[in-house]
Amino acid sequence: MALQAAYSLLPSTISIQKEGKFNASLKETTFTGSSFSNHLRAEKISTLLTIKEQRRQKPRFSTGIRAQTVTATPPANEASPEQKKTERKGTAVITGASSGLGLATAKALADTGKWHVIMACRNFLKAEKAARSVGMSKEDYTVMHLDLASLESVKQFVENFRRTEQPLDVLVCNAAVYQPTAKEPSFTAEGFEISVGTNHLGHFLLSRLLLDDLKKSDYPSKRMIIVGSITGNTNTLAGNVPPKANLGDLRGLASGLNGQNSSMIDGGEFDGAKAYKDSKVCNMLTMQELHRRYHEETGVTFASLYPGCIATTGLFREHIPLFRLLFPPFQKYITKGYVSEEEAGKRLAQVVSDPSLGKSGVYWSWNNNSSSFENQLSKEASDAEKAKKLWEVSEKLVGLA
């Protein structure tokens, strides 16, 4: 059979050598010179015809003179090298993934079996326990330390991530600080008010540093997602509940350039609830500016979203007890805007990976029937001139300019 296979590699015009062994129909027959029998000639002709028919039906092969190696043309449905590159799991970095929306999103992505999640969190042990508590498999996540209230921690996280030599396909800026009842401001390591320093400046530096990594991604859709908030969108009912978000002319934020950090972006008196709302406007303005500056050049999709009101989330843990008691039923039965953490996580996971939500520069929201749509940003959250100024001031504050 070995010689028969070798014959199949030769052009049909080459004749059989006059001396050798020929294996046909699993029976070895010896022939020498001119002593061919009529039976052997007939057997030879029949075998060659069979071999030619097999060659006609099988893929062509390229052979060397000795026919020592055989290279078959790959089947038409075999993955190309470009397709094979995207068969790996996607890698998504999610900030604040130890609880709430971040944890629910990490689980939703991990459950698909198509993603490895980097849980970028301030409390390593809390994140590890949280991942196990929701049943995430160890092979689907990695916990890495990140404290967005420290610009040095942000830089260290980026350095540590790059040491892993993992690709980066999606960055989700989710973590947030909310101190609505605070009477006095708290500050970050660099002296910024805690809400703007964590929610905006920490994420601003992180997104700028990791943009280079996103550019290199060969994943089908590389994305940067910033979680927004309806409370910072003043063209909605919730956005008009006092105190309303208002960045003014950014004089308070810009004062940090002179070492005179203000507790409020607009330079006004401190208000914990407004500080949070202002920071979310900054998030949405940053997303718009990232889209304008980098989408066309890099192919990265930049988007923000409001997944619905997660009224039971730990984000409200510093609100007064009466608020925490009444707010969930109010959202469930009056406004109908309530969503569970699990549902909100699935929505954010959609924005991470769903091809139908791959449009850049969009602020995504959901109807009560869970259908996604492109929401309208308020004038404050879509002001191109203010976004540019915020970008320039923020670059200087985090040391990028």
Swiss-Prot record:
Pfam families: adh_short. Its EC number is 1.3.1.33. Residues 1-67 form a transit peptide. Disruption phenotype: No visible phenotype at the levels of the whole plant or chloroplast ultrastructure; due to the redundancy with PORB. Porb and porc double mutants have a seedling-lethal pale-yellow xantha phenotype at the cotyledon stage, contain only small amounts of Chla, and possess chloroplasts with mostly unstacked thylakoid membranes. It is an enzyme of class 1 (oxidoreductase). One of its GO terms (cellular component) is chloroplast membrane. Belongs to the short-chain dehydrogenases/reductases (SDR) family. POR subfamily. Pathway: Porphyrin-containing compound metabolism; chlorophyll biosynthesis. This is Protochlorophyllide reductase C, chloroplastic. Phototransformation of protochlorophyllide (Pchlide) to chlorophyllide (Chlide). Expressed in flowers, upper leaves, rosette and cauline leaves, stem. Not detectable in non-photosynthetic tissues such as roots and seeds. Part of the FLU-containing chloroplast membrane complex composed of FLU, CRD1, PORB, PORC, CHLP and HEMA1. Induction: Up-regulated by light. Not under circadian regulation. The keyword Phosphoprotein does not apply. It comes from Arabidopsis thaliana (Mouse-ear cress). Residues 65-90 are annotated as: Disordered. One of its GO terms (molecular function) is NADPH dehydrogenase activity. Residues 81-90 have a biased composition (Basic and acidic residues). It catalyses: chlorophyllide a + NADP(+) = protochlorophyllide a + NADPH + H(+).
